[in-house]
């Protein structure tokens, strides 16, 4: 098991940067969501980039199975420690499949997949994805994602992820949903929400005439305080088109608001996750400054759709560039 104490921090130097040995062209994730025992199946389509072994980051993951090109691997074919999974001998192209078990309820770091209030949420910037599954968890590895998830339909009826929704429903007491993001993205922009939420919905017509479905997802009782947030989102989308010619590139854009989200707001592709402080506002309870903060933060995170999400950083010395550009 890749577990144990948080490893001591070591200095990271720009001069030490090396390109990844393997790139991930596509990743398929399948989640069986349970608060204390979530199972994550991952299927990575890999392509060699430079010489060297395949090293995947992973922390606090219980490895259940591993297969390479359909062949189950014995423990003599890989090495596993508290921070990584390494395969020393790899073909230049391969499909790697792993299954792991994680404990979102015990994840008090609020990094990776964790429980909060009404459900499951994620925060993967900067290195949270490695607490979900084994992966080259670095921003210069960009992949297309296909996500399936199942959860208790009574407790977690709403299942959200990046990209466009392909399917959803209820089967044998389990809610299920399937999402696909057609645009390559780094792992730090992965997002998942499974919770009992309600949505304020609207739509936006892009400059080319496409209809985009908009949703602001909040806890029950908070939906009356979302009008300003929805208006701010639509104004941001229009401004980005008019000023920079940047049209939104998916069919759906969602915001999910979490009361104890520890990052303020996060620009995950197609599924922004916010602290409620930057979403909820009405004339009875909010000041002018509150309204301005909602407008400012929603605009900033939406603008990351191009400067940060589609065009991202190579390493963690570069985010200041796209953040200031945004």
Stretches found by the model and what they are:
Residues 24-30, 81-86, 129-133, 161-163:
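Short structured motifs
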Residues 51, 58-116, 137:
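A surface-exposed beta-strand-loop module
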């Amino acid at each position: 098991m890749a577990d144990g104490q948080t490893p001591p921090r070591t200095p990271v130097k720009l001069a030490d940067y090396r390109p990844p040995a393997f790139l991930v062209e596509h990743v398929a994730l399948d989640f069986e969501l349970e608060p204390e025992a979530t199972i994550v199946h991952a299927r990575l389509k890999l392509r060699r980039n430079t010489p060297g072994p395949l090293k995947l980051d992973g922390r606090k993951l219980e490895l259940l199975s591993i297969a390479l090109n359909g062949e189950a691997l014995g423990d003599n074919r890989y090495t596993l420690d508290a921070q990584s999974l390494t395969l020393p001998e790899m073909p230049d192209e391969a499909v790697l499949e792993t299954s792991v078990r994680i404990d979102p309820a015990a994840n008090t770091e609020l990094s990776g997949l964790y429980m909060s209030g009404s459900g499951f949420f994620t925060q993967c910037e900067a290195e949270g994805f490695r607490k979900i599954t084994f992966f080259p968890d670095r921003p210069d590895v960009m992949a297309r994602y296909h996500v399936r998830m199942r959860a208790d339909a009574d407790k977690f009826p709403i299942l959200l992820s990046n990209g466009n929704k392909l399917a959803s429903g209820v089967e044998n007491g389990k809610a299920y949903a399937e999402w696909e993001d057609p645009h390559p993205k780094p792992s730090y922009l992965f997002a998942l929400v499974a919770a009992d939420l309600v949505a304020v919905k609207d739509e936006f017509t892009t400059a080319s005439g496409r209809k985009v479905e908009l949703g602001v997802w909040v806890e029950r009782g908070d939906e009356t305080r979302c009008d300003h947030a929805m208006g701010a989102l639509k104004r941001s989308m229009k401004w980005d088109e008019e000023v920079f010619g940047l049209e939104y590139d998916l069919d759906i854009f969602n915001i999910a608001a979490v009361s104890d989200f520890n990052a303020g707001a996060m620009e995950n592709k197609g599924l922004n996750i916010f602290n409620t402080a930057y979403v909820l506002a009405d004339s009875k309870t909010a000041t002018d400054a509150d309204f301005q903060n909602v407008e400012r933060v929603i605009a900033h995170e939406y603008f990351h759709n191009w400067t940060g999400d589609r065009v991202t950083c190579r390493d963690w010395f570069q985010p200041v560039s796209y953040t200031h550009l945004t």
